[in-house]
Amino acid sequence: MRKIFLYFIFIFFTFNNSFACQLLNVPIGSDISNASSTFEFLDDYNEEVFGKNNSARYEDYAADFCDGSDLKGTDLEVIVYQSKIAGINLINSDQENNNLIYEFAKNFIRDPGEQVKNKDWKGYVDLSVGNLVIAYTKTNVGDEIFEYLEISNIEMFDYTID
């Protein structure tokens, strides 16, 4: 009986992380009518306004969509193409906390590696899983460090590029 109880506790905590981060529960390529239950700001999307060949970008605070993460000061960018979710990006430019997205990726997706925590490290790490294209990037813009996590899929990736 004790083993069964421990098993249920383990399952609860395993699934609790992903359910607490609603932004990871929105499938790339899904219709915005489904995604708007998580991202209410998508209710304003109108494909006719953006045209058939243009993507729309919406921004909000990432922390509002991911309980249990430390994404304070991190921007969430949701990219919509032809009424479908083309990409979900996290962007952090907080110079005091420049490894927030690293911690998020490590806890919710996969560890990009300890080397990316180094303040001097700049580059890209492929964290792709299945048909999801996931990239962790750290770069300089001027004197500031920017951290990115970009999530898309093979079919929608081209529509996430400006």
Give the residues covered by each predicted segment.
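Short, compositionally biased low-complexity segments enriched in polar/charged residues
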Residues: 58-82
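Non-cytosolic coordination micro-motifs
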Residues: 20-62, 82-162
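Generic detector of short alpha-helix boundary/capping microenvironments
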Residues: 8-9, 23, 71
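Sec-dependent N-terminal signal peptides
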Residues: 4-16
